[in-house]
Amino acid sequence: MQKLFTQAKAFSRRILKALENYGRKGLGVLTLCSLLASSPVFAGIPLKQGDGAVNDAQVNAAIEVYNRIPASIRLQYELNHNSITFFNSKQRRDNVIGMYTALDGMEANIMLSDQDLLGAYALAHEIGHYFDDVVYKDEEILLQEKRYGNQVFRYVTRGKRSRSEEADFVAIYQQEANQNGLVTQYEKSDSTEYFAGSFKAYVDTPEQLQVVAPSTYAFIDQLVTEFNASHPVPEEAVTA
């Protein structure tokens, strides 16, 4: 297990070195297709030891999901020194399998349940919350905090912190959520959860998402395209 956690840190070190060598200015923009085709390079995952009882199967499942996320989003998550941990599900009674906490994508932590593989498979949903957060500047938010074990979870009681709370995506949510069978009933509960669930579908089954919820797919795809352009991945990091 310790070997897996050690290997999980390799991606950050390689990316940071590439940025030191080349800087961000003038780096070519790589297409999403080419980034995903090169995903074996991103073998690591920014795991931090939590209080969960994690086994190799859970870590490997999380790594497999993580490597399906667009590379520009993974890169930014790691460059901001954000982390992923597993929490002890036996100490909780609310059946939560994943949580995301951050401020504009900074000081972020994704917390996953150590119950079977449920937490690992929820990773794309939680990264969806991160992406929704990092592309949007918080507006007049009021935060409260809860502590889960040794982790602090921040949640908003007022204001906006996500792109999916804007009127254009709320309209898409109201139009397509009920017909989108790729998301759960919980993910249909509001526009932010719908964005996270649809981002997971965008990562897992993009062709199906494009069929059942075309406006949702187009919205997320446009955000990813714009993020790729504004956060290019160093070519050395992709081909190393």
Predicted feature residues:
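A metal-dependent hydrolase signature that marks the N-terminal structural subdomain at the beginning
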Residues: Q2-L4, A8-Q115, S215-T239
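Active-site-flanking segments in enzyme catalytic domains
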Residues: Y77-A240
